[in-house]
């Protein structure tokens, strides 16, 4: 069902393609948001106090919906009418995807494809376009999809500000638009789907690490890239927790999600400071690389956070790490398909559609370990009941 499409570079996309991008620019040194030894630096321009307060409250909220289907659950639902989008028959669903450039997105997309297969009686065609992590390509992709007679458009934006005009153009074309995973700076989509969010993720990890560190200890913060709302808000919340705990943040570095670069950064800080007492990460894809850097240097692995990637969970168990795994569940990739079909049925959906965001701790770690699945698989896939499990994810 997956179809590869080539983005058009025609005159019709020139207006949007001319927008400035908030993609990170390449830097030989991986310039960070705070220079080494300068603490957490200034608060991110993405920080919104009310959103921060709301997300922290949502961490303790009880969801509505089927108890065994967290991808259908909603936290504090705010229902919106979708009657104007009701259409009979089977539907053509189009998906503009930021990228398939890391294991989290790859696992998520496999989950989405399986959800489409499970809904094949209601979906006539599923069109997927991979923007390859490029803002300008995704802008062109969305413009192209507007001419493909899609019944609904799903968007996972590469970056927040730059993709906003393209999403607004899709809304103006009359398409029901569903945004998920990463947000945009407009309220025009029918719904925005994601778990609790970046503030919740960042807070959980930073609170744990700062509490497990020795007082006044040195912490290294590892980030992936700037300009993506869910990553910026993770750092915003972590900054608040780390500042409050008076942690000595000796560096904030961007890894580009590259294990080799991560190892080099961690090793450089070990060489510079001798001891690093805590590691906070805005995503767990390179958590194993960070652990290995300490092991290679003959240093104890300090308290840290990772994510629900199985290689990290196994290492945590085997090496008895002091760790926590806030999650951004890949089961959220099922929800946009479910939402799009509900909208085309004229059924109310929540906007925003906030999904539960579980945390893996030492107490529940064993529940999420699965030796039968690949190391880069994510425990929160919510995919066990889908067609092709487990082979599709191996």
Where are these regions (language model features)?
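N-terminal export and membrane-targeting signals
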Residues: 1-11
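C-terminal motif of bacterial Sec signal peptides marking the signal peptidase cleavage site
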Residues: 14-18
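A residue-level marker of the well-folded mature domains of exported/periplasmic proteins
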Residues: 19-394
């Amino acid at each position: 069902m997956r179809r590869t499409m080539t983005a058009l570079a025609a005159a019709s996309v020139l207006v949007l393609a001319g927008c400035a991008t908030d993609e990170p620019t390449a830097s030989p040194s991986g310039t960070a948001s705070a220079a080494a030894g300068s603490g957490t630096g200034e608060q991110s321009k993405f920080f919104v106090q009310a959103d921060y307060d709301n997300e922290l409250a949502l961490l303790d909220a009880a969801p509505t919906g089927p108890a065994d289907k967290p991808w259908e659950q909603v936290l504090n639902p705010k229902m919106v009418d979708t009657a104007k989008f009701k259409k009979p028959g089977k539907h053509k669903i189009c998906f503009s995807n930021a990228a398939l450039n890391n294991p989290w997105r790859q696992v998520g997309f496999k989950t989405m494809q399986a959800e489409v297969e499970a809904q094949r009686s209601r979906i006539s065609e599923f069109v997927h376009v991979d923007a390859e992590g490029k803002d300008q390509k995704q802008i062109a992709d969305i413009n192209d999809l507007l001419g493909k007679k899609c019944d609904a458009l799903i968007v996972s934006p590469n970056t927040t500000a730059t993709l906003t005009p393209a999403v607004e153009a899709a809304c103006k074309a009359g398409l029901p638009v569903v945004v998920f995973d990463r947000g945009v700076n407009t309220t025009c989509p029918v719904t925005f789907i994601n778990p609790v969010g970046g503030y919740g993720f960042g807070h959980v990890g930073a609170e744990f690490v700062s509490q497990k560190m020795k007082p006044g200890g040195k912490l290294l913060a590892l980030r992936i890239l700037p300009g993506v709302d869910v990553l910026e808000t993770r750092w915003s919340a972590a900054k608040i927790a780390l500042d409050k705990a008076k942690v000595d943040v000796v560096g904030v570095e961007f890894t580009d999600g590259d294990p080799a670069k991560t190892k080099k950064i961690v090793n450089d800080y070990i060489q510079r400071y001798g001891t690093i007492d805590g590691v906070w990460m805005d995503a767990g894809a390179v958590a194993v690389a960070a652990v290995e850097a300490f092991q290679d240097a003959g240093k104890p692995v300090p308290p840290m956070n990772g994510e629900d990637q199985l290689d990290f969970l196994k290492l945590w168990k085997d090496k008895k790490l002091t760790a926590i795994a806030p999650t951004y569940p890949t089961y959220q990739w099922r929800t946009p398909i479910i939402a799009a079909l509900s909208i085309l049925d004229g059924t109310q959906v929540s906007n925003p559609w906030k999904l539960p965001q579980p945390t893996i701790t030492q107490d529940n770690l064993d529940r999420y370990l699965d030796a039968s699945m690949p190391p880069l698989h994510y425990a929160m896939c919510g995919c066990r009941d889908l067609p092709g499990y487990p082979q599709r994810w191996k």
